[in-house]
């Protein structure tokens, strides 16, 4: 269906040699599960954390599938409580280094 195909258009995988970055946009956990079941992703070096660190995004299934080394959360002052403590705990439990635009400002990622 059109709605189902839209689910897969919300993610971007950027690769340069062995360096891979995954951007999942505002996907929720259920959609992330469908995504990892549909595609064989490489290990991810940098993951742009979904939905500004919402408790409903960047779930354990995704994290176990793509094993990211670094998580970047694009977030500013907001009334939603993003990123949530639950999301931050999932990221650190997955062994990721986490960077946040509300704490570090602009984040520059370079690849040699």
Features from the language model and the residues they span:
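Short, small-residue-biased leader/transition segments that mark boundaries at the very start
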Residues: 1-8
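Short beta-strand scaffold segments in enzyme catalytic cores
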Residues: 10-14, 107-109
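Beta-strand-turn-beta hairpins that frame and shape the catalytic cleft
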Residues: 15-21
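Residue-level marker for buried hydrophobic side chains located in beta-strands
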Residues: 21-23, 49
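Gly/Thr-rich phosphate-binding loop signature of adenosyl cofactor/nucleotide-binding cores
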Residues: 26
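Cap/insert and terminal regions of metallo-dependent hydrolase folds
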Residues: 33-106
